[in-house]
């Protein structure tokens, strides 16, 4: 397709502003590793919250949502909507603990909580496991989406897309560090929101669609609009709702939705002014991420079922797209080619914004692990601040090149999502309990990481999967994930009680620094100390329940409003307001003062 001059002006202007921000903050960011990775720990809640939202926009997210909606309907999004429980657990229980820990990365936590050689090994291994392996997988999926957008909208080859995107993003990331990422995220948030909303409004009202009512009553769409799965279809109900709600949210490690907090979300919490700002940032993120942001993508996905009802129709419209990249996730990019001049430039700028924001975050996050938790711990403990920053910049380049190579081999966003989800299945409960139960040790985590990875790979091998899972096998396909969780959990519990506990002095030091409280520490600090310190978790759980009601009601209220059912939308909005009122009534009980 041809891009008009106005669109190019919008895109180039945006890129120029972005690179200018990186250039302005580059001198300050290069002073030391704390500035480069955490911006001096002085960020306000609203800026960090917006950064969290912008970071998770990502070019692959609308593609993933489109893939889900076209295959499983709107209700299929429960596979990630359920992570709201994980997010709110981080908000009301873990955000202040992370900020009080005062670590540079969440991986540094390991040598604070555990002791001896196992702790040192776990810190170094986890740094490479998450910062390199998982990080490259995630970035590969993001770059895959960029390749598909480049092929459909700009007529670029995969190598051209990766080359152009890589030069701009890596240049920005190595210059500005974390501060550059966060400052640019503030701009990216508004550009990306405007682009996604504008695209959804225009595309739904195209003559081919005929408006929202014509869309939701179209034969290709009518059975896809429900926000809940069909309760009469047992298999669909179990797969789309029961397993995510009963098992997935607490058991799986997924970037941006880590049980107990972690990754680039933890990086932003650690950069906050104090624990109150850390909590405010994560609450704002969860409201925006789940209640409002998905709907523009969902509407475009539904509209794509009218214009491109199947993969064959996409292939017919875009014959230049390579066959190995064809899939339902391509429908989002295909729909964007229908946009008019001006709006197309804004949307392309928003997609570039999403790509740069997410990749920059992943690069800075991964580099922080490599520098703080591997290089300075395992290779060069006496490294100067300048050396740390230089290694961080070199790591940024290498991580991107590895993810770019992977992107050229990938084909589908949903397949990668499912694989990453299963690869970390069963480890989540450890990340939740390790703050509150003294008996968990380094071997608990080591065993869980290895068993989860090995079992998930085995279960995805055809020779094993065909025997255990499927219509004619021992168990239905949807039992694959719960079985990985069950096996992993049993193994790490056995290992925990079969290995000695951590050194008591280390446990006492950890408790005094973070003060998690609760009965799980009674054997270490004594009953009197537990009573004296108090325990905010019960109040936190109440806050979680109220916030769940508020955000899910806002999510559904927005959907019903779009569908034209104003009565149900109004009722849900009223319930959300009541939940919000009681949530802020108990605000002081969890010692949170954001404003």
Predicted regions and their residues:
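Membrane-embedded helix-loop-helix hairpins and adjacent transmembrane boundary segments
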Residues: 1-595
